[in-house]
Amino acid sequence: MILDKIVEATKIRVAQEKQVESPEAVKAAALALPSDTGFPFEAALRQQDFNFICEVKKASPSKGIIAEHFPYLDIAKEYEVAGAAAISVLTEPDFFKGDKKYLQEIASTVKIPVLRKDFIIDEYQIYQAKVWGASAILLICACLDVPTLIKFRKLADSLGLSSLVEAHDEAEVQMAIDCGARIIGVNN
């Protein structure tokens, strides 16, 4: 299954990233930043009856490279001008060709909230999201058990990050509810 391959690759990537920048350093950097307890990502989704989270994505496992020339900043600016409530930015490099620089540069350019879209399996990635300028993170039920979902959601809350909890079926929607998710995304 592709999700299993992505999670395994993510474990390797996170271990390598921890060798470059220690978990203690990333945590300290995240904790040194102000926490916006107003949760701007959630507030943005409440602005109107219909709100859009628009995605900046270079590739996917099913489609391959979507855009060889990838003007991610221009795309993000166009989304903002078009009225997007928030922008989802892929940071997973192996299967989606994402990059932390996409998130960092978009977050520092647009005025709307930005979600780190990745396969979050380690607290380290949540601290990274905060440091990189995200307003929210994606937590995928299929990758995590309920205790871990709760732990990660609470950590994100403490940093002022919203959690969009993704479910693929009815059982995962129940998992999202059980973990106290305030935002649930259904992907099937």
State the predicted function of each range:
Residues 36-48, 96-119, 141, 148-166:
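Alpha-helix-loop-beta-strand connector modules within alpha/beta enzyme cores
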Residues 2-67:
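An N-cap/entry alpha-helix motif that binds or orients negatively charged groups
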Residues 67-90, 109, 123-136, 150-152, ...:
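Alpha/beta enzyme core
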